[in-house]
A protein has these predicted regions:
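DnaQ-like (DEDDh/DEDDy) 3′-5′ exonuclease domain used for proofreading
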Residues: 1-89, 95-125, 279-285, 296-303, ...
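Conserved Class I SAM-dependent methyltransferase catalytic core
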Residues: 116-169, 422-439
């Protein structure tokens, strides 16, 4: 059997080995040159084709379920959603060797020589695309177990940068205590990386295991600024008239005993303020900040962490800084977030067969950490559709308008060519979650409302776009590019949506529709896509002033990239 090195002489081979040894560094290395190429990799354009029959609810649709290889879907989304996704959650195949990782339509088993390299290459290609989709303040969560946690961590560092890591969360699972392992595993991991950690907002969440009586739920944080020690020598602060008090009316008594701070005389408080100025003596923390507060006329100021801060004197004479508490207390151990067993039972009640789904509560919590109530949430290993279920549940609870994008392959293999996980599990679950259903016990379960468009990826050679790309695919790509919900292509030659229009041909009736639409548009705000901008510009004449005329398929090809 020949290989690519057979024709090389001894000295050339030695040179190759020396260069390889010199390049090897501490870190993640996988056999990219030796493994079987991923058949999903291609340079074709990827169109998204709507299947209205498998969609749910009435158009227009804000949520998307995409059937196809996620490498293709991610490239299509890079064209339409680059920099627009606030939160990504994925639960990729765990690569245990137990028929959980499909590569080139075949399961990769434990005996495969390059099992880990195949998995790393597969993930690397997709994570690179995912990074481009994240908004500047976006975050990605990746579930993983012990089999690949260390390799995945190094891979995430390579793709996103080690300085972008927010946390390695540990999710306490129910575990499998029936097996004979010496140590029973009762946890998995969730790696969290931010596009830009410095602008990732403080999570507006308190761990659900914190009791409601905890001080974490108080609206303010109060701490005395008295601090005596070698680094905080005794000094004076003058509190002028008008300095705030923590009570409305009364007397703060002179303090000249062992207590700090020392107060030279009794002070009267009226209407929540000192009636006259007084000198107080102590060692201080935040003395400079307190004096800035005084100099600023007792208006709230920002501390070093950007928190609103004010200062008050209490009835006992203590000086306190008072900070507005943000409801944020996220810890790295995730407990009581549901279980795969409970959510498996939920799917059984829906009459949907799927093993080991992630708990809705877990993903709901992660989304709450990472996004606001208008965020778009992406899952490109959608499985049973738990991420979309979590989004719908959150919206129902807080009235939010989050949107989901799910990507799932059919998971058909050589042995199961008719399998379609996306259609029969993922989309079917969401039809029932949103529309309501009767469970296997005969009980009626109310829907959470909402709908989704069901799309399929379709590869088209870039040089054949003008011939192979149909008008509906163009229209849907343009709607997504302009952050519009998807609607049906009207089967004519013209469609418009807000300030967006697509002229598919130059029939007189369709050009007239364009004229009518332009009369309703804001000056300078209209974008018209056409297959011949030169011809359209000639037809419109002065009407084209202030209108953006964009050429097809060139514009889509350029946005799609490589």
């Amino acid at each position: 059997m020949t290989n690519k090195y057979d024709h090389l002489d001894r000295q050339t081979l030695i040179g190759l080995l020396q260069r390889r040894d010199a390049e090897r560094q501490l870190g993640l290395v996988w056999e990219r040159d030796e493994i079987e190429a991923d058949q999903a990799l291609n340079d074709d354009f990827v169109a998204l084709s709507l299947d209205a029959g498998l969609s749910h609810g009435e158009a227009p649709w804000e949520n998307l379920i995409i059937e196809g290889d996620n490498y293709d879907a991610l490239r299509a989304l890079r064209m339409t959603h680059k920099g627009a996704i606030r939160c990504i959650y994925i639960d990729p195949p765990y690569n245990t060797g137990n028929k959980d990782f499909v590569y080139n339509d075949r399961f990769v088993d434990k005996t495969h020589r390059f099992r880990h390299s195949l998995w790393l290459e597969f993930m690397y290609r997709r994570l690179q695309l995912a990074k481009e989709l994240l908004a500047d303040d976006g975050v990605i969560f990746v579930s993983i177990d012990d089999n690949e946690i260390f390799r995945l961590g190094m891979l995430m560092d390579r793709v996103f940068g080690s300085d972008r890591k927010l946390a390695c969360l540990t999710w306490q699972t129910d575990g499998n205590f029936d097996n004979q392992a010496k140590i029973k595993i009762a946890h998995e991991y969730v790696l969290a990386y931010a596009k830009n950690p410095e602008i990732f907002p403080m999570p507006a969440m308190v761990d659900p295991n914190v009791p409601s009586t905890s001080k974490l739920f108080r609206s303010e944080i109060r701490n005395t600024i008295v601090k005596n020690g070698p680094k905080n020598p005794v000094s004076e602060i003058f509190l002028p008239a008008g300095f705030p008090a923590s009570f409305n009316e009364g007397i703060v008594h002179k303090r000249n005993d062992e207590r700090w701070p020392k107060i030279e005389r009794d002070i009267c408080v009226l209407n929540g303020c000192l009636e006259s100025g007084v000198v107080v003596r102590s060692g201080w923390a935040n003395k400079d900040l307190c004096q800035k507060f005084i100099a600023g006329g007792f208006e709230n100021i920002k501390d070093s962490k950007g928190q609103d801060t004010r200062f008050e004197i209490t009835s006992t004479g203590a000086i306190e800084n008072v900070k507005v508490r943000s409801a944020s207390h996220v810890i790295s151990v995730l407990r009581n977030m549901g279980s795969t067993q409970a959510d498996s039972s939920l799917l059984v009640d829906m009459d949907i067969q799927f093993t080991y789904p992630k708990p809705v509560n877990l993903i709901q919590y992660l989304i709450s950490i990472a996004s606001d109530d208008k965020a778009t949430v992406l899952d490109f290993f959608a499985g049973s559709g738990t991420t979309a279920h979590a989004v719908a549940k959150l919206n129902a609870e807080d009235g939010g308008n989050r949107k989901f994008i799910l990507v799932s392959s059919t998971e058909a293999t050589e042995d199961t060519p008719d399998k379609n996980l996306c259609r029969d599990v993922c989309a079917e679950r969401m039809r029932r979650v949103l529309g309501g259903y009767t469970n296997t016990k005969g009980q009626s379960v109310e829907g959470l409302d909402g709908g989704f468009a069901y799309l399929r990826t379709r590869r088209i050679p870039k040089h054949r776009l003008a011939l192979k790309l149909d008008h509906a695919e163009v229209w849907h790509a343009l709607q997504l590019l302009h952050s519009r919900p998807l609607s049906h292509w009207p089967s004519g030659g013209f469609a418009s949506d807000g300030e967006l229009a697509y002229l598919a041909d130059f029939q007189a009736a369709h050009v007239e529709q364009l004229y009518e639409w332009l009369r309703t548009c804001t000056a300078g705000g209209a974008s018209v896509y056409t297959w011949s901008t030169e011809r359209l510009n000639g037809l419109l004449g002065e009407t084209a002033a202030g209108v953006s005329l964009l050429p097809l398929p060139h514009y889509l090809r350029e946005r799609f990239g490589h």
